[in-house]
Amino acid sequence: MNYAQSGVDIFKEEKAIKGLLSSIKTQRKGIGKPLGGHYAGMVEFGKFALVLCTDGVGSKVKIATDLKKWDTVGIDCIAMNVNDALCVGAEPIAFVDYLAIDNPKSEITKEIGKGLEKGAKISNISIIGGETASLPEVINGFDLAGTCLAYVEKDKIITGEKIKPGDIIIGLNSSGIHSNGYTLARKVIEISGFSFKDKFPEGNYPGKKIGEVLLTPTKIYVKEILELLKKVKVHGLAHITGGGLRNLPRLNNNVKFLINDGFEPQQIFKFLQKFGNIEDKEMYQTFNMGMGFAIIVSKENKDKSLKILKKYSDSEVKVVGEIKKGKGVEQKKLGLKYSG
């Protein structure tokens, strides 16, 4: 099985996005002038760039509803946005959420709010507003998304253009699937004969239901990345989300990202691959496969960066690869290559 067969075609999505962008031409001048970006968009604001990014939790919310456990999807909503904002070297400061729901119930919204609050606290941001829309004729269940505001001094923007052969790729491990690939994950559970309420098989995740493992919140990398940026000149930052390793060339398509010592994927990935009969290449271009965030620094800054990240992060931190001449991404152990 692959992601497209489960209902999500990432290549079709890319074409659709290009179609949308082809219709958008208006650009402001002066304050608010677009400054580009990759994971997040930037606009002119004096000596600063204001940074905006929008993302959602996706179909992970369907599992939350199935288990009637809504208290962590708010963390995911915050995480998906603040982690993207970090990728241009920006510090997240504020957030607005968007909740579309078929039948607003306080017992659901209160739990969603708990997760949003926890995510905001971890990220040190303020939730300053939002929108809750009751859409019974449009939506079945609910959809949760948000927008993050961040800022960065213009001379400290990180675009990835400084990435060069010889640089080192440092990885921070993920907590699991995070918030991407859930349409495929849910399809695997469906065809395998399991349910989200079943205990996880084969002795992994003792006592936990499959759905509980899948609801593990997305890691938030704000603290350790901001501390690193204070002390090290970072060449590139990548949030490993939908598209898996194919996220890396977004930073710089004129070099090759060689992953030669990646993280061991958590058991949830092995479970999905086994019962979904999913090929390695599809797994690594759909899921994060154990690595939630990547940092590219010069070889000279490797040890200093590792020391800082290990001090401030509760994630596993290690060198996962290096930058070579060429293009795209290579996962050396499995012989996987992606053009980006």
Which residues make up each language-model segment?
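N-terminal glycine-rich phosphate/pyrophosphate-binding loops that anchor nucleotide-derived ligands
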Residues: 1-86, 124-128, 164, 171, ...
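Glycine-/charge-enriched secondary-structure boundary and capping motifs
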Residues: 2-5, 108-126, 139-142, 195, ...
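Short, contiguous clusters of charged residues that form electrostatic/catalytic patches at enzyme active sites
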Residues: 18, 40, 76-80, 114, ...
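Glycine-rich anion-binding loops of enzyme active sites
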Residues: 21, 44-49, 57, 76-77, ...
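Short coil/turn connectors at secondary-structure junctions
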Residues: 27-30, 37-38, 45-49, 68-69, ...
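Glycine-rich, charged/polar anion/phosphate-binding loops
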Residues: 38, 130-134, 152-158, 221-225, ...
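Short, flexible active-site-proximal loops enriched in glycine and acidic residues
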Residues: 83-95, 282
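Acidic, glycine-rich loop-and-beta core segments that form the ion-binding/anion-interacting portion
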Residues: 165-208, 212
